[in-house]
């Protein structure tokens, strides 16, 4: 399943489309968003690796079908509440005070030939700084980062930061969870401890081991289930990163220490 970005818009607020309806329109030939070439790779299963946000969304919808409840509600009852993640929400409608969450910013102005996002791993190949998802620090893949992009990543050719808006998108199980670093720490602790945090089990230990297992080593030697391995600080890390408009996140575990 490929991501066809032209039909995956950001909404001002939560998506107006329910997850199941969106996926039906995306994945079925009669769907509004369907494109055989745009939505699917022509590679045979098990022969190629493609990062897929809509693949993650489809897993979220599978949770809905198996549990007979919306994905966000399932997570509330089975992950967030058991782990006492009191400030965690997939949807903006679940947040009482939007002033409590960070406003994303976007870059505007410039001449089109400077860095257009802040962070490592989200630069276009046509721009002077291009980093891939494996880089750990800016200097790993862009030795002149500060010179080209400025110390804060805002560039030097009329680039300005301006507030965007609180947004959502239809494939939301692939991202858009809003929470605190302390809450994520509880979730990560459960992974480190075989699915248990503070005496509460959210996953079986066998499930954790399956997630950690590289699925197709001949294709991608770093990819487990959703999460992946990378080298950093002279050790192997396991986790995931993500980027959206005005946002870049990383969460990794070191099983060494």
Predicted segments, located by residue:
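Short, surface-exposed loop or secondary-structure junction motifs
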Residues: 1-110, 151-245
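Secreted, short cysteine-rich peptides and small extracellular cysteine-rich domains stabilized by multiple disulfide
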Residues: 111-150
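Beta-strand-connecting loop/turn residues
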Residues: 127, 234-236, 256-257
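Residue-level detector of short, conserved catalytic/binding motifs and their immediate flanks
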Residues: 139, 225, 249
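Short, surface-exposed beta-strand/loop micro-motifs that present aromatic residues
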Residues: 247-256
